[in-house]
Amino acid sequence: MTAQGNIYGINGPIIYLKGDSGFQMNEMVYVGTGRLVGEVIGLTSERTTIEVYEETTGLKPGEPVAGTGAPVSATLAPGILTSIFDGIERPLNAIQKESGCYIDRGIHADSLDTKKKWHAHMTVKKGDRLYPGAVIAEVPETRAITHKVMVPPDMEGFVLSVAEDGDYTIEEPLVTIQKKDGSEAVLSMTQKWPIRIPRPVSRRYPASRPLITGQRIVDTLFPLAKGGTAAIPGGFGTGKTMMQHQIAKWSDADIIIYIGCGERGNEMTQVLEEFSQLDDPRTGNPLMERTTLIANTSNMPVAAREASLYSGLTLAEYYRDMGYHVAIMADSTSRWAEALRELSGRLEEMPAEEGFPAYLASRLSQFYERAGMVQNLNGSEGSVSIIGAVSPQGGDFSEPVTQNTKRFVRCFWGLDKNLAYARHFPAIQWLTSYSEYLTDLSGWYETNVDKSFVEYRNRLVMLLNQESSLMEIVKLIGSDVLPDDQKLVLEIARVIRLGFLQQNAFHKDDTCVPLKKQFKMMEIILYLYEKCRALISMGMPVSVLKEEKIFERVIAIRYDVPNDRPDMFDGYKKQIDDFYNSVMERNA
């Protein structure tokens, strides 16, 4: 028997019921005659507090509230990929057919198509013992991704009957099992899972493999591990969304969950348009076939914004349990924190710093701690990597969301508006950014790319830091007073900035660069530095070295050397040797 109650008070998205109405904490409820979706967030003997995930305009005291007896849950089955949902996993395509461009209040649609038939290949037989997470069937969801239908994490038993291979809807029975207590359970392709509860795993692994993004400053200088967490803070116009789009397009994750949380609707439109036209470089299939979008844009109800991150995480953990590597793009966690602040204000809670609730840090940690490289219940290995954009007002990194986020992420890609306004993209400021995964991943780089990879990376960072120190002197008294070896540092740092850190998202070779090419580019830049330093130690001035235009040719490598032609780097070494010899001959 589900609980029933009547509205006693309304305060924006917050609804109050008088007395103890028999509801459970976090229970999903239907509010009012329009049956708006809500969730129980507070219970006392005097009143029940509910947050409503839809617009509450027109609700009146006395209207009924009906419980469902279950928490707010995500529907997990084939059909998630290529779909676009709102914050509580309602399909926007189906809603658009029913109510047009805007979501009507109280509209209900199945999260996934219950009429579409999927071809299921059964992987179990009668009499098999099934444990939690065991794969009972395989369904080709897209050309690149095989959906594995699993036993729910809270169920196990012996197989009593199995359906034949064939076409089934997501609700038709596939396997009947006998549980430990002797009762029978019917398994279909569909599972339900509460969005606020992490799905269980066997064990968690330390970081050991990088999430390769094709962006040089990320992969080489500040790498992110598979199963890791990263924050991209930056002011307005610094390129947070573009950075996340680039990672969503080119990273070597199997599946991308893109959560548009409180940002502009046009950004989601851009993802839909671009991803449908681009092909995955690994499989050759459209990028949209490995992507799911959760759109909770700035004009949608605030309460659903808070739920959208948990919905996306639950979908990601479901695919992780199949053995896939999933990357979540959350754009932006600041808008999510603002939703927490607004709801906290409605609940009349004591505000903390800048009006955010005192539990902001614990909510952020609940979100980021669901990332990780894990061994699943079925023995497979999967990961969830989280990349969260942070939008501090005025680009001030000392505000609470950025500061609390830094506590829970191990990778920090701070965007700089001065770099962005100078048209340097990605606008990641190399002096303030960091990655704590570098030591964990150094063994992987040395084994899979080159033994010198980490050493070269550290030398690049050292040169950039030297440039920063020298620029303070240059700003005061100019560069002419510097000795030639320091002038060379400034020139090589310019080559690193323009030829390595800067990247063109619209160039076919420069938009995504393989690690082998990244290493070769570092090698050439440092080879040029060593040769020039040798010349300067013999008394050659930097002005003579700059006459040959060798620095400009090295900067242009990113365009001139195709990604599939690493052999061309030998020609650049020869050019640098020829440059060295010609300078020696002319000044002998």
Language-model features: locations:
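P-loop NTPase nucleotide-binding/switch module
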Residues: 97-153, 169-229, 243-246, 281-300, ...
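C-terminal amphipathic alpha-helical interaction region
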Residues: 539-588
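N-terminal accessory targeting/assembly segments
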Residues: 1-104
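P-loop NTPase catalytic core
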Residues: 220-221, 227-553
